[in-house]
């Protein structure tokens, strides 16, 4: 009888322990569902600074599940940000289908909270995800009006006050749809100049730094026009076919936006692409984005003209190359490789920080189904040529280990895959296998910063 009592007591104790363990596991799952940033335990072990100096970005493990992060390269861990100059934030990373995650990136410099957009397929959803990550607002010194407490209120304010300009590579909807949809909220009304307590960062901070006063805006209801930049064919398509009072209200005509048509192969100081005079711009000439020059290049995108934007820092000489859609044509003849090599010839290889380029399909996709897109084998052939075609050092550089290759426009995996892999995983594996030059492959995740 005594033995039976001991056995019953032991079984009861085991039952209680199992229930406690199960309860804690359920709480952990609940916490994971609710917490869209890093875990509370990790956050307690980290100190947070007041600016985005790159020292407080987290390991991929903090955001990605094991199924995802184990085939991503590190992109915003402390070691990657320590020596970085720029930070880019993916607002959308896929090509077509997923309307909440289409091609768009923000770019800024460490220490700045003014951003330029590179394509604009998805804007709202990417910014909403970004602004709700823990510590983003502290790291980038984002200040909101006192009433902006809801995610949608903060998303709207970030768009108004922190996104200055849009560089649009071509006019397909998966590259401009986000800009069109957010345009009703994408402006700062002049009454915000008097908001209390005053907001001294973003575009509001810029206006104050340039010495403007409330009385300077009496003839306009908007503090600053935002700029939409692209090749003439792109600008014409946006203005004629989208902001045309039929597909969408013509908001640029109300002073929301100003178009800038850029000529292929001509370099423009950013100070010439904003609605301020040169004397005013001298006050911020060494700050981002005014310290940057941009040179657009015409690309092939099947039967449409697309664009690469080459950004050069006028102070450090560092360069970043952004490619909108381009690649193997299916319906027309076009020297798509030659046009990309024209970009390579303008790059100083030791100054190159990053390349954004699409990889829409896996290697087994036939040319007849490409329609102006790229596969991993195409991309890595281009990387081989980058070392050959670019402006070299003496002695010449023999690898691309200092360059981040940010892969964009990956089409979702809607067909059967024998391994059950996402297209991101297939493409990452194929890029890695053909990476002869050591370029640092990044498969971006919506809203997660990448130091470059």
From Swiss-Prot:
Listed Pfam families: PDEase_II
Top-rank taxon: Eukaryota
Main location class: secreted
Catalytic activities: 3',5'-cyclic AMP + H2O = AMP + H(+); 3',5'-cyclic GMP + H2O = GMP + H(+)
Induction: Up-regulated by Pseudomonas aeruginosa, PA14 strain infection but not by Pseudomonas aeruginosa, PA01 strain.
Gene3D superfamilies: Ribonuclease Z/Hydroxyacylglutathione hydrolase-like (3.60.15.10)
Disulfide bond residue pairs: none
Keyword annotations from UniProtKB, A to Z: cAMP, cAMP-binding, cGMP, cGMP-binding, Glycoprotein, Hydrolase, Nucleotide-binding, Secreted, Signal, Zinc
Subcellular location: Secreted, Extracellular space; Cell surface
Enzyme Commission number(s) of this protein: 3.1.4.35, 3.1.4.53
Family to which this protein belongs: Belongs to the cyclic nucleotide phosphodiesterase class-II family.
Designated name of the protein: cAMP/cGMP-dependent 3',5'-cAMP/cGMP phosphodiesterase A
Organism whose genome encodes this protein: Dictyostelium discoideum (Social amoeba)
Gene designation per UniProt: pdsA
């Amino acid at each position: 009888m005594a033995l039976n009592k001991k056995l019953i007591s032991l079984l009861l104790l085991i039952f209680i322990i199992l229930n406690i363990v199960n309860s804690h596991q359920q709480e952990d799952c609940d916490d994971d569902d609710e917490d869209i940033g890093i875990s509370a335990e990790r956050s307690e072990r980290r100190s947070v600074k007041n600016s985005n100096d790159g020292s407080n970005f987290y390991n991929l493990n903090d955001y990605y599940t094991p199924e995802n992060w184990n085939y991503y390269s590190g992109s915003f861990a402390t070691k990657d940000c320590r020596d970085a100059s720029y930070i880019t934030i993916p607002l959308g990373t896929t090509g077509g289908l997923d309307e909440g995650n289409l091609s768009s990136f923000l770019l800024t410099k460490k220490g700045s909270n003014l951003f330029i957009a590179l394509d604009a397929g998805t804007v709202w959803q990417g910014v909403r995800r970004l602004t709700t990550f823990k510590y983003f607002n502290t790291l980038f010194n984002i200040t909101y009006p006192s009433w902006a407490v809801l995610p949608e209120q903060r998303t709207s304010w970030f768009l108004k006050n922190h996104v200055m300009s849009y560089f649009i590579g071509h006019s397909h909807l998966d590259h401009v749809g986000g800009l069109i949809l957010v345009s009703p909220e994408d402006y700062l009304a002049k009454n915000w100049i008097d908001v209390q307590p005053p907001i001294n960062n973003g575009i509001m901070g810029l206006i104050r730094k340039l010495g403007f006063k409330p009385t300077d805006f009496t003839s306009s209801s908007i503090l600053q026009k935002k700029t939409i930049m692209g090749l003439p064919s792109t600008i014409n398509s946006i203005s004629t076919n989208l902001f045309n009072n039929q597909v969408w209200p013509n908001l640029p005509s109300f002073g929301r936006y100003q178009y800038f048509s850029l000529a292929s192969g001509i370099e423009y100081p950013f100070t010439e692409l904003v609605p301020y005079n040169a004397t005013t711009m001298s006050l911020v000439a060494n700050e981002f984005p005014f310290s940057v020059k941009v040179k657009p290049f015409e690309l092939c995108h099947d039967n449409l003209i697309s664009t690469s934007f080459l950004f050069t820092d006028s102070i450090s000489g560092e360069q970043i190359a952004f490619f909108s859609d381009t690649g193997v044509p299916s319906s027309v003849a076009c020297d798509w490789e030659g046009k990309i090599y024209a970009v390579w010839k303008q790059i100083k290889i030791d100054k190159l920080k990053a390349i954004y380029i699409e990889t829409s399909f896996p290697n087994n996709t036939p040319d007849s189904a490409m329609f102006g897109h790229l596969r991993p084998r195409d991309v890595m052939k281009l990387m081989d040529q980058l070392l050959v075609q670019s402006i070299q050092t003496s002695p010449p550089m023999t690898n691309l280990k200092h360059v981040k290759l940010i892969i964009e426009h990956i089409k979702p995996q809607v067909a059967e895959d024998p391994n059950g892999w996402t297209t991101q995983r297939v493409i990452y594996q194929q890029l890695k296998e053909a990476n002869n030059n050591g370029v640092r492959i990044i498969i971006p995740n919506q809203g997660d910063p990448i130091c470059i």
